[in-house]
């Protein structure tokens, strides 16, 4: 499948530089805290499993050249998170962000992992399970499309722009159902920008403002609560909350897994 300058493989699996734009967390937001605890999740680690005959959530990766900087980023993240408990208080977010910022995006490194379903707003491609307490994904955003307004299930979310542009729309949690959600901040992210959000900052939605090309972003979620327990999306007109299962990837390590039923919010 040829999309703009990228060629994305869609084979079904049959075996088990400097940041010049503001970050996601705007300066006027409350300072991030590692103590979230909105959901009270049980401390169960993310384990490998099988989906449509393909092993997902594995902790190793062989489909990236070991001499690439992208592979080195993954290994650095894995080492940083090694030995950490499955608790949001254990994570050094600033070090995670710095590692992601140090990587200069190169399409050759990751384009075979960035599969895209043009019929959906965005496609979630699983890359690796980091020690059972974090997962790394590449999201491919269809032109002009966005996610729903959503939370992050008491997890930290670090985002690295790999290509294109995204706009973050930031919202406060509603005090009660029936309250219309008002966007309080919009932030643009372009190639190599790194951002961060957790539930103490608020809700957000992400949108691709480009009308003629996809945008691509790298996401690290730690702990990986959304994949394990799901998250919540919110109706903009009423603040009504809906639980969403986020366990189904569109692809895993470049192999198509869920062509028709992958999870998005």
Swiss-Prot record:
Highest taxon of source: Eukaryota
Induction entry: Expression is under the control of the ZCF2 transcription factor and is regulated upon white-opaque switching. Transcription is also up-regulated in both intermediate and mature biofilms.
Catalytic activity: L-cysteine + O2 = 3-sulfino-L-alanine + H(+)
Biological-process GO terms, alphabetical: L-cysteine catabolic process; L-cysteine catabolic process to pyruvate, using cysteine dioxygenase
Location in chain, cross-link 3'-(S-cysteinyl)-tyrosine (Cys-Tyr): 157-221
Biased composition (Pro residues): 24-33
Disruption phenotype: Displays reduced hyphae formation in the presence of cysteine and leads to attenuated virulence.
Residues that bind Fe cation: 150, 152, 204
Enzyme Commission no: 1.13.11.20
Protein purpose: Cysteine dioxygenase involved in sulfite formation from cysteine. Plays an important role in filamentous growth and virulence.
Family: Belongs to the cysteine dioxygenase family.
Name this protein carries in UniProt: Cysteine dioxygenase CDG1
Species whose genome carries this gene: Candida albicans (strain SC5314 / ATCC MYA-2876) (Yeast)
């Amino acid at each position: 499948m040829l999309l703009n300058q990228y060629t994305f493989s869609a084979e079904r699996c049959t075996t088990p530089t400097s940041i010049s734009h503001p970050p996601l967390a705007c300066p006027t937001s409350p300072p991030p805290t590692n103590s979230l605890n909105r959901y009270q999740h049980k401390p169960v680690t993310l384990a490998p499993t099988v989906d449509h005959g393909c092993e997902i959530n594995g902790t190793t990766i062989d489909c990236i050249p070991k001499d690439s900087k992208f592979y080195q980023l993954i290994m650095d993240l894995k080492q940083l998170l090694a030995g950490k408990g499955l608790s949001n208080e254990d994570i050094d977010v600033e070090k995670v962000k710095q590692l992601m910022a140090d990587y200069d995006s190169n399409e050759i490194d990751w384009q075979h992992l960035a599969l895209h379903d043009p019929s959906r707003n965005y496609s979630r491609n699983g890359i690796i399970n980091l020690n059972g307490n974090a997962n790394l994904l590449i999201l491919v955003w269809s032109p002009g499309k966005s996610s729903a307004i959503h939370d992050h299930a008491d997890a930290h979310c670090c985002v690295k722009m790999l290509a294109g542009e995204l706009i973050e729309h930031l919202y406060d949690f509603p005090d009660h159902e029936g309250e219309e959600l008002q966007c309080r901040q919009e932030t643009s992210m372009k190639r190599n920008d790194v951002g961060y959000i957790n539930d103490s900052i608020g809700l957000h939605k992400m949108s691709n403002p480009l009308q003629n090309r996809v945008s691509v972003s790298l996401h690290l979620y730690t702990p990986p609560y959304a994949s394990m327990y799901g998250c919540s999306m919110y109706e903009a007109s009423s603040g009504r909350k809906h639980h969403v299962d986020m366990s189904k990837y569109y692809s895993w390590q470049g192999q198509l897994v869920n062509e028709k039923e992958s999870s998005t919010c």
